[in-house]
């Protein structure tokens, strides 16, 4: 901080807020040392509470990225997220109460996913006071239960083969999900359009703009979203 004059850091640890005592100690130490720094972090919705948010705000936290994943209780159980819709709503509302930006990550194509469960996810994202939302197709990565299930289905370790030789690259089938990439992409576009082109969201974005350069960037992003 003193040597390189760092003004902002982003904590990528997805489990940063899992140990409340540790988080509060870090926040108090930042305040004790008078470190004037802005920072953001990742969090689950069920590991954050008001006491923690108060200290995080005092210590310079200005944005939290939440892995919400789905807005359907059945899907959340299937992917073993072990969170509830009520916890999602509480975490986001508490974060906004303390004037911290809330960013939500959502995934389409989970095991058991249907058009109906995707609609539930989109509707939840629209009902939350999120500043930003990101929607993606599920990626099956090594080390996850989903990948182990897929590996058993395929009868091979795709990632091991791919790492050794890129010629083995191919689209992986989805485990327990019959929705095609084309359908998922349509829902992703629908979600982005519905989320970012609402009057309230446009107002939030305009309110957050601090420069002409930033304004131009948002305009380009909006045009790109419409075209693509």
Sequence positions of predicted segments:
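Hydrophobic alpha-helical membrane-insertion signals
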Residues: 201, 213-220
């Amino acid at each position: 901080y003193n040597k390189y004059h760092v003004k902002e850091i982003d904590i990528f640890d997805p489990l940063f807020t899992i140990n409340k005592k540790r988080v509060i100690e870090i926040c108090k130490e930042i305040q004790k040392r008078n470190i004037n720094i802005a920072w953001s972090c990742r969090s689950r919705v069920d590991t954050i509470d008001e006491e923690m948010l108060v200290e995080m705000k005092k210590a310079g936290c200005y944005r939290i990225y939440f892995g919400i994943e789905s807005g359907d209780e059945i899907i959340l159980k299937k992917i073993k997220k072990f969170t509830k819709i009520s916890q999602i709503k509480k975490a986001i509302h508490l974060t906004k109460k303390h004037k911290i930006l809330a960013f939500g990550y959502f995934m389409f194509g989970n095991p058991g996913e249907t058009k109906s469960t995707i609609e539930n996810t989109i509707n939840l994202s629209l009902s939350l006071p999120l500043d930003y939302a990101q929607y993606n197709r599920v990626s099956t990565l090594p080390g996850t239960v989903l990948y182990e299930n897929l590996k058993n289905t395929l009868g091979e370790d795709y990632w091991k083969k791919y790492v050794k030789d890129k010629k083995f690259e191919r689209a992986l089938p989805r485990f327990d999900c019959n929705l095609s990439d084309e359908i998922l992409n349509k829902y992703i576009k629908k979600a982005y359009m519905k989320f970012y082109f609402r009057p309230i969201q446009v107002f939030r974005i305009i309110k957050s703009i601090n420069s002409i350069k930033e304004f131009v960037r948002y305009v380009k992003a909006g045009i790109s979203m419409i075209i693509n």
